[in-house]
């Protein structure tokens, strides 16, 4: 009993893994916000190209968040727009407008794990995860970095195919509940992508925005970096911004 009792007490004090993931998600969703984004894609050989993006987001009741993303530069992607409806407890919805085709189409579930505009980020990385799509468990507590280390596994094969990985390991700060790193494993259980959070922008409502993050593809040695600038929170955003019609303007 000497060893068992302390272990039981530690387990009782440890928050449920799904609750930690849910809290981390909720802290990253603010009332309204606009910003510019630089997306830089670096090839294995060192050459790089950048995309300039504008983003406006607004949150609603029950964890619903809507986001409009518009590509400004370079010329070959200018006018491309995305509408993201980020649901907390149900499937996210995404649409993309392609100016060359003058057509808006819905990004279907099977495309969620595919590349976001040829970067190392996936379409799913552009949304907050639906907590119920995964089972979550603690792997260990890292005393050195003061982190929760949580493994998230898709609840079934369909969800695994949808997200494009067999499991994800998240490193979350214990004191602030902020995700600091994510590791993604393929269907052969091999680590193939790492996303690291480089900096956080604190918001006035006690929440936060991931200001700078980098995705490294271990298979291709490509790297993609997202950096936010000109961040304005609490902006007045009309609901008409988040419509198919606005995508095509």
Regions found by a protein language model. Give the residues of each.
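Short amphipathic beta-strand and strand-loop transition segments with alternating hydrophobic
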Residues: 55-58, 135-142, 198-200
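N-terminal mature ectodomain segment of secretory-pathway/periplasmic proteins
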Residues: 15-100
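A short, amphipathic edge element
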Residues: 18, 49-51, 126-139, 189-194
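Boundary of Sec targeting at the N-terminus
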Residues: 11-13
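Gly/Pro-enriched, hydrophobic low-complexity segments
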Residues: 83-85, 93-96, 103-107, 112-129, ...
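Long terminal segments
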Residues: 244-249
């Amino acid at each position: 009993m000497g060893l068992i009792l302390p272990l039981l007490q530690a387990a009782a004090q440890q928050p449920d893994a799904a609750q930690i993931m849910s809290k981390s998600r909720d802290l990253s969703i603010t009332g309204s916000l606009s910003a510019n984004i630089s997306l830089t894609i670096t090839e294995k050989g060192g050459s790089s190209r950048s995309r300039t993006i504008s983003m406006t987001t607004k949150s609603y009741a029950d964890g619903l968040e809507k986001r409009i993303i518009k590509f400004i530069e370079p010329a070959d992607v200018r006018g491309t727009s995305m509408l993201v409806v980020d649901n907390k407890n149900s499937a996210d919805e995404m649409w993309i407008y392609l100016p060359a085709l003058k057509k808006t189409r819905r990004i279907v579930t099977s495309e969620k794990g595919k590349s976001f505009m040829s970067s190392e980020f996936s379409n799913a990385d552009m949304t907050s995860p639906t907590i119920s799509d995964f089972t979550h468990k603690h792997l260990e507590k890292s005393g050195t970095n003061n982190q929760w280390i949580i493994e998230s596994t898709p609840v079934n094969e369909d969800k695994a195919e949808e997200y494009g990985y067999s499991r994800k390991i998240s490193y979350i700060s214990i004191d602030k509940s902020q995700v600091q790193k994510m590791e993604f494993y393929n269907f052969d259980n091999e680590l193939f992508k790492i996303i690291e959070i480089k900096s956080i922008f604190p918001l006035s409502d006690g929440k936060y925005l991931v200001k700078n993050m980098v995705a490294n593809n271990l298979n291709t040695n490509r790297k993609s970096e997202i950096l936010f600038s000109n961040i304005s929170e609490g902006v007045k955003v009309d609901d008409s911004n988040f419509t198919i019609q606005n995508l095509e303007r």
